From Swiss-Prot:
Membrane topology: Multi-pass membrane protein
Function: Conducts the efflux of homoserine and homoserine lactone.
GO biological process: homoserine transport
Highest taxon above the source species: Bacteria
Similarity comment: family membership: Belongs to the Rht family.
Pfam family, one: LysE
Name of the featured protein: Homoserine/homoserine lactone efflux protein
Source species taxonomy: Bacteria, Pseudomonadati, Pseudomonadota, Gammaproteobacteria, Enterobacterales
Keyword Transcription on entry: no
Length: 206
């Protein structure tokens, strides 16, 4: 893989990670409600889920999800239901302003697992990776090394972007002056979770 080819993938991966989705929403809500340490656990979970998708694509299972309507539909509806459930939970969240107290309500391990599930139940992610990776793989060169390069690049880029979203969320949290504003923010993010869940439910198999 040439540097130019890798740089083209880097730009593509960056644009994709910057696109707001369930991962970004999950990172921002976790950062606001559970502090930066909670966000770190969430980001680690997202990258774990992404890494699993990359491995599945590498061993050929990504093609199964891209070709099997049943597999796509099962994962799609599981993901949509989970995101809508997260949105409902966010709507019901207390409007407390003390982030240090909120950070104790869920362990970082639980936030980590939640983030893994958010990424794993997104069939569009694995289908897109299955379609994208081959476009940047040079058949005349060792494929395993190229998959590793693309996979590591994807994870590092997404980690940096999600860290940016977490930092932005922390700045938003600093503007919150009382419980009413926190509750309104929880409802806003809860609505976004449900919207993304609804959009995922309406997604059609290519």
């Amino acid at each position: 893989m040439t540097f130019e080819w890798w740089f083209a993938y880097l730009l593509t991966s960056t644009l994709l990670s910057l696109s707001p989705g369930s991962g970004a929403i999950n990172t921002m809500t976790t950062s606001i409600n559970h502090g930066y340490r909670g966000a770190v656990a969430s980001i680690a979970g997202l990258q774990t889920g992404l890494g699993i998708h990359i491995v599945l694509v590498g061993v050929g299972l990504g093609t199964l999800f891209s070709r099997s309507l049943l597999a796509f539909e099962i994962l799609k509806w599981a993901g949509a239901a989970y995101l809508i459930w997260l949105g409902i939970q966010q709507w019901r969240a207390a409007g407390a302003i003390d982030l240090h107290t909120l950070a104790q309500t869920q362990s970082r391990g639980r936030l980590f697992k939640r983030a893994i599930f958010v990424n794993l139940t997104n069939p569009k992610s694995i289908v897109f990776l299955a379609a994208l990776f081959p476009q940047f793989i040079m058949p005349q060169q060792p494929q395993l090394a190229q998959y590793l390069i693309l996979g590591v690049t994807t994870i590092v880029v997404d980690m940096v972007v999600m860290t940016g979203y977490a930092t932005l969320a922390q700045r938003i949290a600093a503007w919150i002056k009382g419980p009413k504003q926190m509750k309104a923010l929880n409802k806003a993010f809860g609505s976004l979770f449900m919207l993304v869940g609804a959009l995922l439910a309406s997604a059609r198999h290519a």
